[in-house]
């Protein structure tokens, strides 16, 4: 039986920590210690006047913010990836940054997409058919740099694309989560589904180097459930003490029980080879209920896109989460990336 080493590992979240910007919706958040000794967060953002809604898919860019310590607050430094033209697979929108460093090179994995037609502006509604069309164009991309400060070189082709419609992952490839071994062998988890509003599932691929070529090592998703209301997304993958380890969001639908009955919770699982996974007996690492450094306790509208900062032994020291305030999930007054130190 798998035990959860992070079941009671979270310390209070620093008030004012993480990364926020009053003029932007902030989402995602992936942190690495740079060659300068500072901590650098790669996050997603889009202008506040556009609304939260669908604009993470139409008007998002990836930025870098930095702090002298892991808790922050992080200060905006630059736009790292933005629009580059409709002819590129990632030319109109980028999201889901996931940063790794190996052999003196920084690898920034992300989701990119493109679309035709008008770019949504303030007050514009995006109907469900257009949203689904662009959602299905999501592909996993990669940018590399010799320094956390750049310059960044973007790959012109996706690292992994959907398969034909005889497979479960025929719509999109998105939400990359990557673990790089010392010899450069790289494992990637990705999200997909077989039809609009179908169950969100996770696949696995492997490459000899962090930049590919990636080949699937399992034809099926890493988890299969009979209940179509069980959705899993936002994987975070790492390798520690001879095991692959996973933190993933329980995103169950239609009032179903999910894996553990707590919607939006982050769940822990382990695997010997990144193929056959087992959830811990008590899998919850975090939920939307947060304890803050000033003693307050709140129920956040969302806590998503989990990312562990790892030390030199690949052991997690801090948990980063995209979060927001509001009366219900995705009904936000503001969003930011928060940080929770671990015991």
Residue map of PLM features:
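Carbohydrate-active catalytic/glycan-binding domains of CAZyme proteins
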Residues: 1-343
